[in-house]
């Protein structure tokens, strides 16, 4: 498409290897077309607000982030393509939103260590993806992050926690809401999505579905929930605006060249190499 001078929208993960991502990004640059990655978490009201507060210095310098996206999965009637690593990359790639969100806030990771494996979902009724993964990210400036993924957790969690020198921000996507805690102990509360009705509906889904909300996935013909519908509409409205000449705000510029998506895949590839070779990996290793 890019070689034929067509603008591109690509869902996440944009590819399952850094080399493929790099070719996609460079081809779009060479042909001067937009390359938007579908990293829809950037359109959460709470995520945008958190970025704004961080830029304003409300929680000071960001020191550490911790995300968790995990739950428990029972055998399904059929094995989804998302459970086959060769097709989806497993949790690390098809749930790459939280990793992307953290790197949008803290910059690209420089070194990665990943541990985990398939601890509870082996057998013919399951795919071959790892069901428990822990990423330890280093950013080269004495700042760090932990990212958890998996479907082997009976206590489901889904959040991004950002710790700074003057406060902290927690974006909770299970008991849905955003909390800003300042150094004097005061707390401020905000919606994660466009309004409280949508937040409450997502909370209900997390506590009532057959599959924990952090790991559930859609099916053809299944209507998207309110929260997903609202952010998809925001994402497509933004993309349509850009296609018709609207300026791109600074916060979204890396999203519109594929560079942020490429950086997330680079970190994911480094994490995969770390797990396979049981060592700490510099992200630049996979970028050569």
In which residue ranges do the predicted regions lie?
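Beta-strand-loop-alpha-helix segment that lines the small-molecule cofactor/substrate pocket
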Residues: 1-42, 57
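Predominantly a Rossmann-like dinucleotide-binding segment in NAD(P)-dependent oxidoreductases
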Residues: 34, 41-127, 278
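Terminal low-complexity tails and localization/encapsulation signals of metabolic enzymes
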Residues: 280-288
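Aromatic/hydrophobic pocket-lining residues that form π-stacking "cages" and hydrophobic walls in ligand
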Residues: 24, 50, 270
């Amino acid at each position: 498409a890019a070689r034929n001078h067509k603008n591109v929208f690509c869902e996440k993960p944009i590819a399952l290897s850094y080399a493929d991502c790099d070719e996609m990004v460079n081809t779009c640059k060479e042909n001067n077309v937009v390359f938007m990655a579908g990293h829809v978490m950037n359109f959460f009201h709470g995520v945008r607000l958190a970025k704004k507060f961080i830029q304003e210095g409300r929680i000071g310098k960001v020191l550490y982030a911790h995300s968790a996206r995990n739950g428990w999965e029972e055998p399904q009637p059929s094995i989804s393509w998302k459970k086959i690593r060769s097709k989806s990359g497993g949790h690390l790639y098809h749930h790459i939103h939280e990793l992307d969100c953290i790197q949008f806030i803290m910059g690209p990771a420089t070194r990665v260590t990943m541990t985990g494996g398939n601890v509870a979902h082996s057998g013919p009724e399951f795919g071959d993806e790892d069901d428990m993964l822990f990423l330890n990210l280093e950013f080269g400036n004495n700042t760090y992050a932990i990212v958890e993924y998996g479907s082997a957790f009976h206590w489901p969690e889904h959040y991004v926690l950002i710790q700074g020198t003057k406060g902290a921000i927690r974006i909770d996507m299970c008991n849905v809401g955003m909390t800003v805690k300042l150094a004097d102990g005061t707390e401020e509360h905000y919606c994660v999505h466009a309004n409280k009705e949508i937040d409450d509906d997502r909370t209900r889904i997390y506590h009532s579905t057959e599959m924990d909300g952090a790991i559930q996935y859609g099916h053809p013909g299944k209507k998207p929930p309110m929260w997903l519908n609202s952010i998809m509409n925001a994402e497509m409205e933004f993309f349509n605006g850009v296609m018709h000449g609207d300026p791109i705000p600074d916060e979204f510029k890396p999203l519109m060249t594929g560079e942020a998506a490429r950086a997330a895949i680079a970190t994911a590839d480094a994490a995969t190499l770390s797990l396979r070779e049981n060592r700490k990996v510099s992200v630049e290793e996979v970028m050569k």
